[in-house]
Amino acid sequence: MIDTPPRGRFGRAMTALALAGLGIAIYLLAARLLGEPPACGPVKGCETVAASEYATLFGVPVALFGVGFSVVLAFACVAWWRRADRRALYTAYGLGLAGVIAVAYLTYLEIFVIGAICVWCAGYALAIVVGWALTAVAAWRTSA
Amino acid sequence: MNKASNVPQTRRARRAAEREAGHPSRRRTAPRRGRSPLLLITGIVGGIGVVVLAGLVLFQGGSGATDATSELISPRAPTPVALADGRAVGKADAPVTLEVWTDFQCPVCGQLATTVEPALMTKYVTPGVLRIVHHDAAFQGAKSTSSYDESVEAGAGARCAADQGRYWPYQDWTFANQAGENEGAYAATRLTAIATAAGLDVETWQACVATGSAQKAVRAETSQAVAAGVNATPTMSINGQTIVGLRSVADLGALIEAAAASPSGG
């Protein structure tokens, strides 16, 4: 494999963002399983979002999907960063794009349907979007 | 590969080495971007994403009013009816009273009712330490442009259920079947289904609801709550100490135990 120039910086940042997303998803899942609202601090909205019907999909907490997704994404990012595996980069790119679509939909639900913003969910969405943007740049540079 | 020992250290040198190691003929004849799988991945993932999103919008968008008369969800932790006393539950001489101003349409009230209160029932109500009293604060329905106020109607149904000694089963079933706000979750047909599931004499219950006096009572108690400073749901009060919003079982438990231990509370 060719060790393309931006791999180090981009790999680190992508992995860090994927792990940040994983941490948030694990926290939200733990709060859900414990039956307690996520701690929002002075910002309100987490309780409303967590209690809404959209917090589960087919009876499964949405946070569980987030945990699974972030684990796979983090593995792909690490594989590219540490092993220069180009397939892993493309996997991260595809997963990231799916993640961006998913968080865009969930953010739409928060703003326009539930009428409340959960800062944890917003943080997760930000990590996914920025992570995917980095992945897209890295993939473009790698393939160019 | 033995090339590894000669990997150029700077970015420019690596790029130069890559150019050198590449195949100039291929680079000239075909744009390298065209060989990239990015476009293919974007197309496939984007296409699948759009299809899945459309499915979700149809599935979740249809889970409100259109599902109103479909099968109801059973309460996960039904309130022990033996401890019920109208819209209160627990011994009348319990040292601590938790008053709750609630709205059947409020999602956080739903979380309080389905996750926190059942734990409090087990830990404090059953042993006789706590009495929980529910009050109406029917705010959410006012956000609807419809003349049918789902918060008020659900609350009225609860009062008529209380007339039959079954407020708590009704509230358990109602909160277990929240489905959006002002979207038909508490349409008359669905409330009737809930009343049936809660074990009420439905004809008597319907006659009670039809008089409109229960709705007036809900609105009156809501006005009293507003006058007393309640402007959000759920609002709670433990022996006079006001708590706005949801709290964990542990947090409420600490307040309950403190109130029970205090001379005025005990």
Each language-model region and where it sits:
Chain B
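C-terminal cap of thioredoxin/glutaredoxin-like
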Residues: N2-D67, V96, T192-G266
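Basic/polar, acidic-poor N-terminal "presequence/leader" segments
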Residues: I41, P75-P80
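Juxtamembrane extracytosolic/periplasmic "stalk" immediately C-terminal to the first targeting helix
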Residues: D67-A77
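A short beta-strand-turn-helix
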Residues: T79-V96
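A generic local structural motif
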Residues: A82-R87, E117-A119, T222-Q224
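Structural alpha/beta surface segment adjacent to cysteine/selenocysteine redox centers
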Residues: A94, T102-F104, G110-I194
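Processing junctions and N-termini across compartments
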Residues: V100-D103, V230
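Short beta-strands and strand-loop turn motifs
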Residues: W101, H134-H135, Q206, P234
